[in-house]
UniProtKB/Swiss-Prot annotation:
Protein's recorded name: 23S rRNA (uracil(747)-C(5))-methyltransferase RlmC
Family: Belongs to the class I-like SAM-binding methyltransferase superfamily. RNA M5U methyltransferase family. RlmC subfamily.
Function (record text): Catalyzes the formation of 5-methyl-uridine at position 747 (m5U747) in 23S rRNA.
Source organism phylogeny: Bacteria, Pseudomonadati, Pseudomonadota, Gammaproteobacteria, Enterobacterales
A molecular function (GO) term: 4 iron, 4 sulfur cluster binding
EC number: 2.1.1.189
InterPro entries to which the protein is assigned, alphabetical: 23SrRNA_MeTrfase_RlmC, MeTrfase_TrmA_AS, MeTrfase_TrmA_CS, SAM-dependent_MTases_sf, U5_MeTrfase_fam
Binding locations of S-adenosyl-L-methionine: Q212, F241, E262, N307
Species assigned in the record: Xenorhabdus nematophila (strain ATCC 19061 / DSM 3370 / CCUG 14189 / LMG 1036 / NCIMB 9965 / AN6)
Length: 375
């Protein structure tokens, strides 16, 4: 992948851009094998490769510059703004959308927030696309509600220019800290979420719910989890840290008793919408802390699926799983180092198979799926 900003030394988000893609995959697989060298692994499966450009479905842009000539991109360490509208990680058609958004910012008088001076209103714009129908969600992250009336006044123009923007909202983030979003979300459109479809499974994206940024690889990851679980012929499972329900909904059929747990109420609403669309009757999704939910249960299903944040599932949950000993644990991880530490605590399990999914090309990061069987 060629990147003008990387070559010029303006952006180094893709730390591995100088490596060939085959070299990147080789290094990631080697890293994963080193982390799991103390654990018994029956089958090492080949890594799942990504497209090397145009694979992201979401752009998170810092807004800077002036209200007349806003810049969308990132803040350099020296304080300069790097405009990333032509970033090759995004599909090419994002560029035209960014240009219209810049005009809208000027028309609405949304003054970009200046970190140094602590002045201005517009901090970020977040743009997400559904690959299922090409609809888009646009979020404006504002310091306050001061400019909402101005924003709403010019909104019809924006919707006329970009009819694919079916969900538009403002998030209010008043603190002067490196926090992406605040608690308050104001939705301006009748539609409140995007519909995505992976492998025939409807999934929904709401403004504040997490969703994978590489849909092709996410689709492969969910499909693989579904295949592995169906081969086990189980009748009950938990999907902990379930997000919008992607894993559990790919694994469950109409007879499977599935319980999905996720701290985000927005994500749980999305998961419930998906389950309803699929007509699943034995599925339950709850907005709870996954670890607390598990620790309170005296019985455990045949399979526990975990997809934790980067910190992993931690000692408490590992000790609980060791004590309760479900037949299977399916572990999906965005941080193989914490996953390896967790698996090392699950001493009575062996890894039946493990596979690397290259969710984040040109970086050291990757996703891992590991099936653990009670030995």
């Amino acid at each position: 992948m060629q990147c003008v900003q990387y070559t010029a030394g303006h952006c180094h988000s893709c730390q591995w851009l100088d490596k060939s893609y085959s070299h990147q995959l080789s290094d990631k697989q080697k890293h994963l094998k080193q982390l799991l060298q103390e654990t018994s692994v029956t089958h090492w499966l080949s890594p799942v490769m990504s497209k090397t450009s145009g694979f992201r479905n979401k752009a998170k842009m810092v807004v800077n510059g002036s209200v007349e000539r806003p810049l969308l991109g990132m803040l350099h360490r020296d304080g300069r703004t790097v405009d990333l509208c032509d970033c090759p990680l995004y599909p090419q058609h994002f560029q035209a959308v960014f240009e219209v958004i810049k005009v809208f910012i000027a028309k609405a008088g949304l003054v970009p927030y200046n970190v140094e001076r602590r002045k201005g209103e517009l901090k970020y714009i977040l743009l997400t696309e559904s690959r299922a129908n090409n609809e888009m969600m646009l979020r404006f992250v504002l310091r306050s509600e001061t400019k909402l009336a101005q924003l709403e006044r010019v909104l019809p123009w924006l919707q006329e220019q970009l009819p694919q923007l079916t969900v538009i909202s403002a998030n209010i983030q008043p603190t002067h800290m490196a926090i992406l979003e605040g608690e308050k979300e104001i939705i301006f459109t009748g539609q409140t979420m995007l519909k995505e479809t992976f492998n025939g499974i409807p999934l929904y994206i709401r403004p504040r719910s997490f969703f994978q940024t590489n849909p092709d690889i996410a689709s492969e990851l969910y499909a693989t989890a579904g295949r592995w679980v169906r081969e086990l012929n189980i009748s009950s499972m938990w999907d902990l840290f379930c997000g919008a329900g992607g894993f559990g909904l790919h694994c469950a059929d109409k007879e499977t008793k599935l319980t999905g747990i996720e701290i985000s109420a927005e994500a749980i609403d999305c998961a419930k919408s998906s389950a309803k669309s699929l007509g699943l009757k034995s599925v339950e999704f709850q907005a709870l802390d996954s670890t607390h939910f598990a620790l309170e249960k005296a019985k455990i299903p045949e399979l526990v699926l975990v997809n934790p944040p980067r910190r992993g599932i931690g000692k408490e949950l590992c000790e609980y799983l060791s004590r309760m000993a479900p037949k299977f644990v399916l572990y999906s991880s965005c941080n193989a180092e914490t996953m390896a530490k967790d698996i090392a605590m699950l001493k009575q399990y062996r890894i039946e198979k493990v596979q690397l999914f290259d969710m984040f090309p040109h970086t050291e990061h990757y996703e891992t799926l590991a099936l653990l069987i009670l030995d």
